[in-house]
Swiss-Prot record:
<keyword id="KW-0225">Disease variant</keyword>
<dbReference type="GO" id="GO:0035721">
    <property type="term" value="P:intraciliary retrograde transport"/>
</dbReference>
<dbReference type="GO" id="GO:0042073">
    <property type="term" value="P:intraciliary transport"/>
</dbReference>
<dbReference type="GO" id="GO:0097542">
    <property type="term" value="C:ciliary tip"/>
</dbReference>
<dbReference type="InterPro" id="IPR056158">
    <property type="entry name" value="Beta-prop_WDR35_2nd"/>
</dbReference>
<dbReference type="InterPro" id="IPR036322">
    <property type="entry name" value="WD40_repeat_dom_sf"/>
</dbReference>
<feature type="repeat" description="WD 3">
    <location>
        <begin position="105"/>
        <end position="143"/>
    </location>
</feature>
<comment type="subunit">
    <text>Component of the IFT complex A (IFT-A) complex. IFT-A complex is divided into a core subcomplex composed of IFT122:IFT140:WDR19 which is associated with TULP3 and a peripheral subcomplex composed of IFT43:WDR35:TTC21B. Interacts directy with IFT122, ITF43 and TTC21B. Interacts with IFT43. Interacts with CFAP61.</text>
</comment>
<keyword id="KW-0969">Cilium</keyword>
<dbReference type="GO" id="GO:0005929">
    <property type="term" value="C:cilium"/>
</dbReference>
<dbReference type="Pfam" id="PF23390">
    <property type="entry name" value="Beta-prop_WDR35_2nd"/>
</dbReference>
<dbReference type="InterPro" id="IPR039857">
    <property type="entry name" value="Ift122/121"/>
</dbReference>
<dbReference type="Pfam" id="PF23387">
    <property type="entry name" value="TPR_IFT80_172"/>
</dbReference>
<keyword id="KW-0038">Ectodermal dysplasia</keyword>
<feature type="repeat" description="WD 6">
    <location>
        <begin position="246"/>
        <end position="288"/>
    </location>
</feature>
<feature type="repeat" description="WD 1">
    <location>
        <begin position="4"/>
        <end position="43"/>
    </location>
</feature>
<keyword id="KW-0963">Cytoplasm</keyword>
Length: 1181
């Protein structure tokens, strides 16, 4: 981090300043001083030039207002940024609140206790409350609108400072005796703060400043120290919270007057003065520290006595009140950033996330890739890759092959230019300094350095990828202590015990090239090692402590920026004679520059470098500077006589939206001069100038200029000089062209002015060349346009190619509907199928399948698409069209379309379907899914098996005593399946019998075959018995309830034939009941006799029946009134009349209705009341 003074504003009449405060949001600067002086200033930059943004832009005072109202010396000024208010107080205790009205500051409120002087005022984080403390111990908390919230007198205490916590729950009060007391936000005392920094301090001390950073811009890392307390004797402590028992301790070694955090809590500035060595007067200085107490640097400030400091809102400037002046210093922060292959990598913190947000901004395509990285330490780049040095995440253990560094606390992550991690390395030393070359990564702590010869995947052979062996690992990773003298042989090993040994002369900077590694130490010693075998070659001695080291492209010179921003150069190979007459290697060059904060060597010239000095960029050639360029950018890259610079300050104001305007290219003087010569003087003179100052970039410039003028001889010579083989070939090709306009068009195309080139071709009536140009560029939209606009016939194959390429363009962007239009025209069936599928346009997909010829290679793919969405029929059609019946059957099975599966299997003589069906059915039965198995058999047209299972269910339900209606339905369903089975057998036989035999004969043969198959099964002979039994059982009860007792008796009498289906006890109980109601006591008596003889009844039940019979037959004789009619019903056997299923009566007429499904009859006069058959419920035809 570097800082330098940039501006000075003097206060009229030499009035001494006491305080200064910079409004972070609006940029106003308030300063107060003696004799009631109070001024509000505003510095504004006016520039439209993109290069002059940020610190480099000239700034002027846009506001300089003196506020009248104080008479005594103004001692405290504080801003309320949320509500744009300024609160000031003077030595008489007068407090004034100012507000901005129509561009100037006016008094809003005044308050004067007249008792004591205000020592400190503090607004809370949201600007709602202010706390004011007086010297006599009075505390007042007020609201932003001027109302008093509470007040308190702390007896016997002299107050000097106050500050709020970030959440406004805690107040810290600093006392005149140096103590700090912690109170809650209602003014209740909680505890005294432990001041570890004052251990062993004697004498009177006072608090110089308390500043609590509120986390508005996020924290450098989670749980980062943010509360700074500093005393006038230079002792300071930085705490994580008010009760932190283990704070960061600093001894600044100076008399302190004030402290302040920057806008993001990453830098603490401490202002004060020091006794200068060998002088009586004090020296004003500002020291800068990190939250962890690391010293970042010292800024010396002229003048007698510094009294206050304040940061600007962006953290790039700091205002210092010294005597009757305000000095401004510019800050050049240590951003975590890098540049690799057109990508700017930068990191920033966000208040809503604990990690660093690392952005990989591809400046060529203006795309950005964001990664969140925990515990980021630094970013280092080289070529196409970058290294992120981070703290290891405790929650994630390392991989198995990292066992030898287990417990490693840091990680070096190798990433490509879009942030993809390629290779992490866990190490056990703090990577304070990281350097990177095309082959090596070097990380150094203060005592040791680690080298890793990295390889990236594209360079690895398959063999190496397979053998990540320990030996190879050790060959690639080494560790060396800075005090060791390695010889360059294989003596470096991965031994972390070396890092534990300390050193008296720690490392302070490193740099490396492909050939050498340079390590700088705090004493000024520079150690030079060879690479890739690390051997100590040379030690040099400098009289400064290096902060940043940099090697030129041939590793002959070293640039050193020290901690105070002085740039010097060292020639590593020069041999000189020292004062004692001995010859030594290495020489400090004469050039020295001050206030330097960045430098970069040219990649292609060892004598060229660019450096940043204050807000100017200088380019040096052989240590001679060119005229400076005004800018504050960080240098990304210097090659081809062009410098690429990035305005990181501007980018980090809005890091989520980097703007290409913040990337600036500067051309160095020789390039500018050559360009001017070519334009004004001509090619001949320019070529002489370039001959005297040769550089490939200048020769290329000359070649391009010669091409523009079609001076092919000069162009070819220049291309040869810059070794541009493509350019030479292009010139040769141009030489063979006859037409001047054709040459001109080619040249225009070469320079990327494609519209102009196309226009020229079309004017020459060479549409083919225009199309060829667009083809090379891949601009298919324009190709299509040109093909369609031409007068002659367009090339069909090219048209198709163009349509397909445009279809691909839309498909890549998932605009399927647009893609379809072009694929149709390009007849690209493969991509069409994909688009229809993505659009869920299955009709279009089906039509496409229909339009394809048989056995087309796309059909199986389309069929699979239908399978994936469950469209069985379309899938089967597609499979059959490409002669894949097995796949069609598998699809039907997969989608549970078993009937279709069986049909296909039969049609294509496939034997395995039966076994597959049986396997699936048994699987269902095992899981007790009998109904699913029945459905499976039914769909597969295996009606007989389905019926068997159905009868089984019906029998089980009957045994359970379920509702009779349900049982009847189950028996009807079973019988219907049997009927379907009969029908199937007949049809199968009809199909088999060919020739002259009649239909009746074939049907009969089918039945005979079926007879042979089913002799064993009783239900195939009389499938309807179960249904009949429960039908009559329900019908008899219904007739009984309706009061038709005679018909009920007739129906109940039928049940005697069904004792094997309905339990006899239920049959004869119902019969007895109906007979008794019908007064047919003879029949009733027979029913009771039957009941008594049943073996299934218990003796108690039999006794109950006996008692009931006794009761009935003591009153009535056991005779039937209508004997003959009942007798005819009681007779069974062959001569039995058919029964009407609607009434239960026998059918005596010759004509009656018969159901076509169950073959049961209904009396002719009854059927007119029914729409469906009373037994099987099939429609009455």
């Amino acid at each position: 981090m570097f800082f330098y003074l940039s501006k000075k504003i003097s206060i009229p009449n030499n009035v001494k300043l006491q305080c200064v405060s910079w409004n972070k949001e609006q940029g106003f600067i308030a300063c107060g001083g003696e004799d009631g002086l109070l001024k509000v200033l505003k510095l504004e930059t006016q520039t439209d030039d993109a290069k002059l943004r940020g610190l480099a832009a000239p700034s002027n005072l846009s506001m300089n207002q003196t506020l009248e109202g104080h008479s005594g010396s103004v001692q405290v000024v504080t801003w309320n940024e949320q509500y744009q208010k300024l609160t000031t107080s003077d030595e008489n205790g007068l407090i004034i609140v100012w507000m901005l009205y129509k561009g100037s500051w006016i008094e809003e409120m005044i308050n004067n206790r007249n008792k004591s002087v205000v020592r400190s005022m503090s607004w809370n984080a949201d600007g709602q409350k202010i706390c004011i403390v007086y010297e006599d111990g009075a505390v007042i908390v007020g609201s932003v609108d001027g109302n008093r919230i509470w007040g308190k007198d702390l007896k016997g205490i002299q107050l000097s400072h106050v500050t709020w916590s970030a959440d406004s729950k805690v107040l810290l009060f600093g006392m005149a005796n140096g103590e700090i007391h912690i109170y809650d936000n209602q003014g209740n005392f909680m505890i005294k703060m432990k001041l570890s920094c004052l251990v062993n301090v004697t004498g009177a001390i006072s608090i110089a400043g308390i500043h609590w950073y509120h986390g508005t811009e996020g924290y450098v890392e989670p749980d980062c120290p943010c509360l700074a307390v500093c005393f006038d004797n230079g002792r300071c402590q930085i705490m994580r919270h008010e009760n932190d028992q283990n704070p960061v301790l600093i001894d600044t070694g100076m008399y302190v007057v004030g402290i302040q955090w920057n806008h993001m809590g990453s830098v603490l500035a401490v202002a004060g003065f020091q006794k200068a060595a060998m002088q009586d007067k004090d020296v004003n200085i500002v020291q800068f520290y990190t939250p962890f107490g690391e010293h970042l640097g010292t800024l010396k400030v002229p003048g007698k006595e510094i009294s206050a400091l304040s940061w600007e809102g962006g953290g790039l400037k700091i205002a210092l009140a010294v005597d009757s002046f305000i000095y401004f210093a510019n800050i050049r922060p240590n951003y975590k950033w890098g540049y690799c292959s057109n990508t700017v990598v930068y990191a920033y913190t966000r208040p809503d996330r604990p990690e660093y947000c690392v952005v990989f901004w591809d400046t060529k395509n203006n795309e950005k890739y964001v990664k969140y990285v925990k515990g980021l330490i630094s970013i280092t780049t080289c070529g196409d890759f970058c290294i992120l040095a981070t703290k290891a995440d405790e929650n994630h253990p390392q991989e198995e092959n990292e066992m030898e560094t287990f417990g490693a606390t840091f990680v070096l992550v190798l990433c490509n230019s879009i942030g993809t991690p390629l290779d992490p390395k866990y190490i056990d030393i703090v990577p304070l300094f990281v350097a990177m070359t095309k082959t090596h990564v070097i990380a150094a702590s203060k005592e040791a350095f680690y080298t890793w010869q990295y390889r990236v995947a594209k360079k690895l052979t398959a063999l190496e990828i397979n053998q990540i062996t320990r030996s190879r690992k050790e060959g690639r990773e080494r560790i060396y202590h800075v005090d060791d003298t390695p010889s360059g042989s294989m003596d470096g090993v991965l031994d972390y015990s070396k890092t534990i040994q300390g050193t008296r002369d720690p490392i302070c900077a490193i740099t490396a090239s492909d050939k050498i590694l340079i390590v700088g130490r705090e004493s000024g010693t520079i150690q030079r090692y060879s690479l890739p075998n690390v051997g100590l070659i040379q030690k040099y001695s400098l009289n400064c402590r290096a902060y940043q080291l940099s090697l030129n492209c041939n590793s002959s010179r070293l640039a050193i920026i020290d901690i105070s921003g002085v740039l010097t150069f060292f020639d590593l190979d020069a041999r000189v004679t020292d004062s004692t007459g001995q010859q030594v290697v290495g020489e400090l060059l004469k050039l020295e520059r001050r206030d330097v904060w960045d430098m970069k060597w040219a990649k292609d010239n060892p004598d060229l470098f660019a450096m940043m000095e204050k807000t100017r960029m200088y380019v040096f050639r052989n240590l001679d500077p060119e005229e400076p360029i005004q800018t504050s950018g960080y240098i990304c890259n210097f090659e081809d006589l062009e410098i690429k610079s990035v305005l990181l300050d501007e980018i980090l104001k809005d890091p989520e939206h980097p703007n290409k305007d913040y990337l600036i290219n500067f051309e160095i003087r020789s390039l500018r001069d050559s360009r001017a010569l070519i334009e004004k003087v001509g090619i001949k003179d320019a070529s002489q100038f370039i001959e005297d100052n040769p550089h490939p970039r200048l020769w290329r410039l000359l070649a391009e200029a010669a091409l523009q003028k079609l001076d092919l001889y000069t162009a070819e010579q220049a291309f040869v000089r810059c070794k541009d083989y493509q350019g030479i070939k292009f010139v040769k090709r141009l030489g063979k062209l006859l037409s001047e306009s054709m040459k001109q068009a080619e040249v225009v195309g070469y320079f990327g002015r494609f519209e102009e080139a196309e226009r020229t071709y079309l004017e020459m009536d060479r549409r083919d060349l225009a199309i060829g140009l667009r083809l090379k560029l891949g601009d298919w939209f324009r190709v299509l346009q040109l093909l369609k606009t031409g007068s002659g016939d367009a090339d069909d194959s090219l048209l198709e190619q163009a349509n397909n390429a445009i279809g691909d363009y839309f498909a890549d962007r998932q605009k399927w509907l647009n893609a379809v239009q072009y694929y149709v025209q390009g007849r690209n069936q493969e991509r069409l199928a994909e688009c229809y599928y993505m659009l869920e346009d299955y009709e279009g997909l089906e039509n496409l399948a229909i339009s394809l010829p048989e056995n087309h290679k796309l059909l199986p793919e389309i069929a699979q698409m239908f399978v994936r969405v469950g469209m069985c029929e379309q899938a089967v059609t597609a499979f059959l069209k490409c002669s894949q019946p097995k796949a069609a059957v598998d699809t039907c099975v997969h989608l549970n379309q078993w009937n279709k599966a069986v049909e296909l299997a039969k049609n294509h003589s496939m034997k395995e379907i039966g076994s597959l069906l049986a396997r699936y059915a048994s699987h269902l039965l095992e899981k007790n899914k009998t109904l699913d198995a029945i459905e499976l058999y039914r769909k597969a047209n295996y009606f007989f098996d389905a019926a068997k299972l159905m009868f089984k269910i019906a029998d089980e339900e009957a045994k359970k005593g379920s509702k009779p209606l349900r049982v009847k339905k189950l028996y009807v369903l079973s019988a219907l399946l049997i009927e379907q089975y009969h029908e199937q057998m007949k049809n199968a036989q009809r199909g088999k019998v060919k020739g002259k035999s009649s239909e009746a004969t074939s049907a009969l043969a089918g039945l005979l075959e079926e007879e042979v198959l089913s002799t064993t099964d009783r239900f195939t002979d009389n499938a309807w018995r179960g249904a009949e039994a429960y039908h009559f059982f329900i019908l008899a009860q219904r007739q009984l309830y309706e009061g038709c007792v005679d018909t009920a008796l007739k129906t109940a009498l039928h049940l005697k034939d069904y004792e094997d289906i309905i339990p006899p006890v239920e049959i004869y109980s119902l019969l007895a009941l109906c007979a008794c109601a019908s007064r047919a006591f003879g029949t009733c008596s027979k029913a009771f006799i039957k009941l008594k003889s049943l073996e299934t009844l218990s003796s108690e039940q039999k006794q109950q029946y006996e008692d009931l019979a006794l009761e009935i037959f003591t009153k009535h004789t056991s005779k039937d009134n209508r004997k003959p009619e009942l007798d005819s019903l009681m007779e069974g056997g062959e001569g039995k009349l058919p029964t009407c299923v609607a009434t239960g009566s026998p059918i005596t007429e010759y004509q009656f209705w018969m159901c076509s499904v169950c073959k049961h009859g209904v009396l002719a006069q009854e059927i007119s009341h029914y729409s469906f058959c009373p037994l099987c419920h099939s429609p009455v035809g």
